């Protein structure tokens, strides 16, 4: 059905009215650039989309009738908005888990920081910021400069510090990561990477991306002092305990008793994974090809918000899972060869098989962290994901029998 949009518009503390519904060309809820562009045209004032309020229909973060809270920076001319009754107290009321960029003052603050940081770096902005994406996991703005666009990304408190993670990898392989122009707490300014995301890329780029990440991870595993401080710990004893705690929590009510018991049984695989000899290192955490960027040459890896310290097998599996079926063997072979050449006596092929169900359980923990860290109206992005990931783990284990 695609995505249709309604916008609840405020100016300062004043509720002005509603615009919509109107269609937009991109189905994904977090992609707000076409929403803001339509509203600027209709209202003839600059606006920012603050947050999602509700969704009717749609699933998986796309499609349906989506309602957003939108802040106008100037008061629009009268008569442009429909006066519909809404819960104004709920719209403007306090919410402990609200993202800083879901408040107008938070957007203004981070854009001011970005402007100052770019000026200090000799990359002064040449026009207004363009809001590209906003949701509970990040806000992304495109900033025009005389030397090309710069991307401002800001992330929540449960995300890894991308600036320090990228810096760690840049010391080992500068081409593996995007150029960082400036960084601060929960925010980073990145140089533009030409090209495309690598959802359906060539076997050569797949092999290069997988092997270069593994090579960098192997080096960082031997340099623990160079790892960023404050990394989430996902080493096998820790993640095993986190999975057990997850199964003790509310997610159990979404599963049958048999499913919970079977998921607990999978935790015993972690010691077997340790036997494979892979070192703990800096893990990307969401190494699917949509987070690889290439213009035909070696890919740069973006979106390091799920980075952590743990077993790199998670990255090998993520690459395989999201590629077209015919290209998955290339990723698996590249990953196995990369680690086999670096850990004499190790068993990376066995690690991939043992860890396949465990990867799904690890993502179940991560999805629960999302749900625990975001405000209620935005939980629709992730509701049901922990249970779905647990069931995926059970299917994976069953398929291996």
Annotate the PLM regions.
Residues 1-45:
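Conserved Nudix-box catalytic region and its N-terminal flanking loop in Nudix hydrolases
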Residues 312-344, 357-376, 389-393:
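Active-site activation/catalytic loop segments of kinase-like enzymes and analogous catalytic loops
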Residues 230-231, 344-358:
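All-alpha amphipathic helical-bundle segments outside canonical DNA-binding/catalytic cores
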Residues 46-55, 124-131:
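A short coil-to-beta-strand element that immediately follows conserved catalytic motifs
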Residues 81-129:
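Juxta-kinase regulatory segment immediately upstream of eukaryotic protein kinase catalytic domains
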Residues 130-146, 151-152, 180, 268-316:
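Active-site acidic catalytic loop and adjacent metal/ATP-binding pocket
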């Amino acid at each position: 059905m695609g995505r249709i949009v309604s916008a609840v518009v405020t100016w300062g503390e004043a509720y002005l009215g509603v615009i919509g519904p109107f269609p937009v060309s991109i189905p994904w809820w977090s992609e707000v650039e076409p929403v803001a562009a339509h509203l600027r045209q209709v209202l003839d004032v600059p606006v920012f989309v603050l947050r999602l309020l509700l969704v009717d229909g749609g699933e998986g973060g796309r499609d349906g009738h989506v309602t957003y809270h939108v802040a106008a920076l100037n008061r629009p001319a009268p008569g442009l908005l429909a006066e519909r009754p809404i819960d104004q107290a709920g719209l403007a009321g306090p919410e402990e888990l609200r993202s800083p960029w879901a408040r107008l003052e938070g957007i203004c603050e981070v854009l001011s920081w970005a402007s100052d940081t770019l000026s200090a770096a000799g990359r002064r902005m040449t026009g207004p910021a363009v809001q590209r994406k906003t949701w509970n996991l990040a806000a992304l703005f495109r900033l025009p400069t005389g030397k090309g666009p710069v991307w401002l990304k800001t992330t929540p408190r449960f995300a890894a510090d991308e600036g320090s993670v990228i810096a760690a990898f840049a010391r080992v392989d500068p081409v593996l990561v995007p150029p960082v122009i400036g960084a601060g707490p929960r925010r980073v300014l990145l140089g533009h990477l030409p090209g495309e995301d690598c959802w359906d890329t060539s076997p050569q780029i797949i092999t290069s991306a997988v092997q270069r990440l593994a090579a960098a991870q192997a080096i960082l595993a031997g340099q623990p002092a160079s790892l960023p401080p404050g990394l989430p710990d996902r080493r096998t004893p820790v993640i095993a305990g986190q999975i057990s705690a997850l199964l003790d929590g509310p997610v159990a009510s979404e599963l049958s008793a048999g499913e919970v018991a079977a998921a607990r049984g999978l935790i015993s695989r972690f010691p077997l994974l340790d036997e494979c000899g892979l070192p703990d290192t800096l893990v990307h955490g969401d190494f699917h090809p949509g987070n690889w960027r290439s213009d035909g040459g070696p890919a740069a890896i973006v979106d390091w918000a799920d980075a952590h310290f743990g077993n790199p097998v998670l990255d090998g599996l993520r690459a395989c899972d999201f590629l077209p079926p015919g290209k998955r063997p290339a990723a698996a072979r590249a990953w196995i060869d990369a680690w086999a050449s670096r850990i004499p006596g190790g068993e990376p092929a066995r690690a991939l098989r043992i860890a396949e169900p465990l990867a799904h359980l690890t993502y179940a923990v991560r999805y629960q962290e999302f749900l625990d860290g975001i405000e209620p109206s935005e939980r629709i992005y992730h509701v049901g994901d922990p249970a779905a990931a647990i069931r995926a783990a059970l299917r994976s284990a069953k398929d291996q029998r």
